[in-house]
Amino acid sequence: MKRIRDLWVRTNLIKKIGIGVVIGLLLGILLPDVTAIGILGQLFVGALKAIAPLLVFALVVQAISHQRSGQQTNITLIIVLYLLGTFLAALVAVIANYLFPLTLTLNTPVNTELSPPQGIVQVFQTLLLKLVDNPINALATANYIGVLAWALIFGLALKSVPSDFKHLIKTAADVTSQIVVWIINVAPIGIMGLVFSTVSENGISILSDYALLILVLVGTMLFVALVVNPLLAFALTHQNPYPLVFRCLKDSGLTAFFTRSSAANIPVNLQLCEDLGLSQATYLVSIPLGAMINMGGAAITINVLTLAAVNTFGIQIDFLTALLLSVVAAISACGASGVTGGSLLLIPVACSLFGISSDLAMQVVGVGFIVGVIQDSCETALNSSTDVLFTAIAENAFWKQKKA
């Protein structure tokens, strides 16, 4: 028994989740009437739902309050590239939804009452009202728009407090993140319950929907990595970007794929920047910063799954509303750094724009965790490799401008 326990502890989370998916699939086929197994999935989603608002608030407050000013000139360009790249990735995901519309099978009645927005004006009205929600109520009701807004305000207000108090804020954020790590560590069991419920209630054919979802997610990320990002690089450097793109994907993206952590991949990226001959003063700032705010892969995940939920509930949206979703997804994605499955936990932020309740949004998050074995690896590979890519092309453009 001890040998089995030690083997389980040594096995990485990706393999554990894969095992959970397989076991849940087999149990759903062989023992579909043992509904108690599905409770494990409900408990897992419930725990995530409980901690997610506090997690978003703590991380954003900590990041804003510790933000440093007076960065170098090309750091500004890198930040612009990070934000622009994240927005473009979100926009590509919206276009992918129009080309390959997806629907999800969720455990909710067909006649579930929703309050879909009536165009861009109502979306803005809803957004503004959620911005000024009571901060305690925003946390209690999972109003993520209000949580983000108040976290930004608190973070700015705390920038001038003594360093000891800032350390306390960081400790609170670290504690919250650790709780999430504990919850994520039982993800294989929770996902087993989710897969069991899905298969036992809907049959084995439901897996074909997940296969299509994975194809759209991974295909969109590949398009951004191999088309959108190279176009940005060419626009700034007027040089063939693909040698640099492939170097970043090989030396940074490959390791990030397996670590599934932009933060864990920072040492790899720093070494790659040194090998590329980039300015140390630049990449020592831009690489850790990119691990926090350069989240194109996360924006893709948020948009693809949110729009799949929108399609599932038959909510009609115009392109301007979808464009606003891209902005919200880009901003929300910046809060996904440093947390396993962070992009999935921010899906309710986007879903709330369309009147989709937190309960239903967390079911979408559950679907995300089922496909997360592949999605999270590809997402991290895109995010982390792009940190080096944008740092390199920004420095190249900066020195070309100085020489001119």
Swiss-Prot record:
Membrane-protein topology: Multi-pass membrane protein
Keyword Transmembrane: yes
InterPro entries: Na-dicarboxylate_symporter (IPR001991), Na:dicarbo_symporter_sf (IPR036458), Ser_Thr_transp_SstT (IPR023025)
Pfam families: SDF
Principal localisation: membrane
PANTHER family assigned to the protein according to its UniProt record, in alphabetical order: PROTON/GLUTAMATE-ASPARTATE SYMPORTER (PTHR42865), PROTON_GLUTAMATE-ASPARTATE SYMPORTER (PTHR42865:SF7)
Task of the protein: Involved in the import of serine and threonine into the cell, with the concomitant import of sodium (symport system).
Protein name: Serine/threonine transporter SstT
Lineage, highest ranks first: Bacteria, Bacillati, Bacillota, Bacilli, Lactobacillales
